[in-house]
Amino acid sequence: MDNHRRTKQPKTNSIVTSSSEEVSSLEWEVVNMSQEEEDLVSRMHKLVGDRWELIAGRIPGRTAGEIERFWVMKN
């Protein structure tokens, strides 16, 4: 039984760690995009859904995180 507790403890810690690393929406910075970028994000989202890496690949200089943050804050 002691081995079971030892192996279970790190899993609990990793869950706590990952949830404590979540970013509150209040801490997000506003992402300003040009009208062209907004249109492209909207069209790409209709085609591929929440595949932010794929969408970011079509918009030079934008990261997947920026695009997702823009989408979440806009919608």
Curated annotation (Swiss-Prot):
Annotated ranges, domain Myb-like: 34-71
GO CC annotations, alphabetized: nucleus
UniProt keyword list: Developmental protein, DNA-binding, Nucleus, Transcription, Transcription regulation
Gene ablation phenotype (knockout): Increased number or trichomes and reduced number of root hairs.
Any one Gene Ontology molecular-function term assigned to this protein's record: DNA binding
InterPro entries: Homeodomain-like_sf, Myb_TF_plants, SANT/Myb
Listed SUPFAM superfamilies: Homeodomain-like (SSF46689)
Tissue/organ expression: Expressed in leaf epidermal cells, stomate guard cells in leaves, cotyledons and hypocotyls, inflorescences, developing seeds and siliques.
Compartments, record wording: Nucleus
Gene3D superfamilies per record: Homeodomain-like (1.10.10.60)
One Gene Ontology term from the biological process aspect of the record: vegetative to reproductive phase transition of meristem
Origin superkingdom: Eukaryota
Positions of region (Disordered): 1-20
Main function: MYB-type transcription factor involved in epidermal cell fate specification. Acts as a negative regulator of trichome development, including endoreplication, by mediating lateral inhibition. Promotes the formation of hair developing cells in H position in root epidermis, probably by inhibiting non-hair cell formation. May have pleiotropic effects on flowering development and epidermal cell size through the regulation of endoreduplication.
Further remark: Overexpression of ETC3 results in the suppression of trichomes and overproduction of root hairs, as observed for CPC, TRY, ETC1 and ETC2.
Protein name: MYB-like transcription factor ETC3
Source taxonomy: Eukaryota, Viridiplantae, Streptophyta, Embryophyta, Tracheophyta
